[in-house]
């Protein structure tokens, strides 16, 4: 009769690995989601993962000991309809359902529309969504917007009065999309209570990205979770 010999060290190692994986998986990630993309801009060629609306406006910089993707100036880009000017999209990747986590810092002056944007469902430069995180909410700021072959239109069911970007402060930001339910949720620092809630099913998949309507800022520590990602060449914008 064959005996199964167990080794406490093997069990301990397996248990430690399981704990490590659990610790590395943020709270709130749905079952069945895996890590589809991760970027901290430590790779010299990290910028090659993106397409941008103006290559001269974006660069990888080192700030306070960490690398980040920086929007350093207003893009020389004229959208066909009223929508953000400064856009950096993850190239050749199409996402449906997802949870996007990242760190954002706003480096511009303080005013009501001081913003950073998260882009999603981006199918063409005139067909996409974006979440606009701004200091003060109004019909054109701090909302979830759709660009559907006409100037952007807000459609969030719930928003806060705005966010406090502060000066030289990094913020944890999360964007969630459930295409079956049509739900869109945006979180800012507190990843348990959304600052924006919206519903729409117009664009069920598309590119993800970062930017600003007309300000400057940086993004780092990008992690995207989801059930799947489609590889498809992005046919628009510039490759740095």
What is each residue range found by the language model?
Residues 24-55, 231-240:
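Extracellular carbohydrate-recognition regions
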Residues 150-172:
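Short, aromatic/His-centered strand-loop micro-motif at the edge of beta-sheets
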Residues 41, 166-197:
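Carbohydrate-binding surfaces in secreted/extracellular proteins
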Residues 78-148:
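Secretory/extracellular carbohydrate-interaction modules
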Residues 26, 86-93, 158-165, 208-209:
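Beta-strand-rich interaction surfaces with strong enrichment in secreted/lumenal proteins
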Residues 41, 102, 222-224:
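Extracellular beta-strand elements of beta-rich domains used
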Residues 195-223:
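Flexible glycan-contacting loops in extracellular carbohydrate-active proteins
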Residues 45-75:
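Extracellular glycan-recognition surfaces and repeat-rich motifs
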